[in-house]
């Protein structure tokens, strides 16, 4: 069976990266990469839907990538997660972080960290279709419109 070509596959090839065991990453490492890939997805959709000024694009994107929005999304889609996905989310949510969000409650920030850890896990394990489906479902279930 052929491995699908993904952005991660191309990055690993271009920079001669060896595959790491994703289960060995800390939940905060998963959240770190998850934050970036989630923002890239949202930015891609926002740009694709409207050619606007950078300031307008930033304002639209920010509504979806801030901690309260991510918290609302993960809360709404928790029943949709598999046991494995929920375990990754819980690891991220319960991780001891030394940073806090400027405009979010501690609870929202922790749930957002769990959400980002899940996004990072799905990205690093090549489950891109599942990651995108959860993002779409989370936005819809949280009553947000992209």
Residue ranges and their predicted role:
Residues 1-146:
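Double-stranded RNA-binding/processing signature
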């Amino acid at each position: 069976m052929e491995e699908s070509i993904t952005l991660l596959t191309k990055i690993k090839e271009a920079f001669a990266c060896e595959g790491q065991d994703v289960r060995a990453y800390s939940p905060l490492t998963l959240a770190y990469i998850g934050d970036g890939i989630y923002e890239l997805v949202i930015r891609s959709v926002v740009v694709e839907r409207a050619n606007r000024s950078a300031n307008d694009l930033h304002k639209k994107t920010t509504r979806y990538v801030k901690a309260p929005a991510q918290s609302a999304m993960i809360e709404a889609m928790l029943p949709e997660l598999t046991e494995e996905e929920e375990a990754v989310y819980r690891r991220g949510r319960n991780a001891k972080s030394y940073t806090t969000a400027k405009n979010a409650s501690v609870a929202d920030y922790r749930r957002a960290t769990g959400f980002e850890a899940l996004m990072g896990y799905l990205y690093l394990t090549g489950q891109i279709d599942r990651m995108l489906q959860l993002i779409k479902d989370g936005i819809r279930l949280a009553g947000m419109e992209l």
